[in-house]
A protein has these predicted regions:
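Secretory-pathway ectodomains
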Residues: 1-229
Length: 229
């Protein structure tokens, strides 16, 4: 059961049929439901959260389903695909919502009783909460846990424990450095010139030995197209 004070709605999850129902928080009257059955693996673990007039469901099914909280209309779905079949029982990663902030959904992979060695390449995903469009996805950066804390965000800094190495990471926009190399010989007027250079990330974390060993020439900066406000 989940309740939304803002929408004056509470919802009920029918595990056996994998469907949702919506009821008035004021009168108890049934408003909508049942929804269309969700993916089969949802029978094991399905959670839900309200945000901005919408109900989001997530869990073992590896799919985020979004509904209108007041009418039950299904608005969109997002599949956290696992193209290399690291998960033994699904084509999707188990996916959990860490938090929703500023119109974006931040999601982790975690699992109740993980198999060791842990599946490789677990994604951390950011979605547009209105459209379900993928804002960014980082495969292998962070793996969450069902038993520890979720990720958190404040001052545009996302803090997350990574259960691959048990380090706590903080990610945000950081400083960068630009290098440009021009021809060191004279060029006739009107001739074309090729400038070469690089843009590197110079955030504090890039100075750690493990990072420097992997990127001896500097960590490439994230492109503008791969970032969002």
């Amino acid at each position: 059961i989940r309740c939304s004070q803002e929408d004056r709605v509470w919802t009920l999850w029918d595990k056996e049929h994998r469907t949702h129902y919506g009821y008035s928080l004021d009168t108890g009257e049934k408003l909508w439901g049942p929804s269309e059955p969700e993916a089969q693996l949802g029978i094991f673990e399905t959670w839900s959260i309200f945000y901005d007039g919408k109900l989001y469901t997530h869990g073992t099914k590896g799919i985020i389903d979004c509904y209108n909280a007041k009418t039950g209309e299904k608005l969109w779905s997002y599949k956290a695909s696992d193209p290399f079949n690291e998960i033994l029982w699904s084509d999707n990663w188990n996916i959990r919502i860490d938090f929703i902030a500023a119109g974006k959904i931040y999601m982790r992979h975690s699992e109740h009783s993980p198999v060791n060695p842990l599946p490789r390449g677990a994604p951390y995903i950011c979605l547009n909460a209105t459209t379900g469009e993928e804002v960014w996805r980082i495969d292998g950066a962070f793996r969450g846990t069902d038993w520890g804390g979720r990720g958190y965000i404040g001052d545009s800094i996302l803090v997350k424990c990574n259960t691959y190495d048990m380090y706590i990471y903080a990610i945000t926009k950081g400083p960068s450095a630009l290098t440009v190399a021009a021809p060191d010989i004279g060029v006739p007027a009107g001739s074309s010139v090729t400038l070469k250079g690089s843009v590197t990330d110079i955030s504090p974390g890039t100075k750690e030995y493990a990072v420097q060993a992997r990127f001896p020439n500097g960590v490439p900066a994230v492109s503008d197209n791969s970032q969002g406000e």
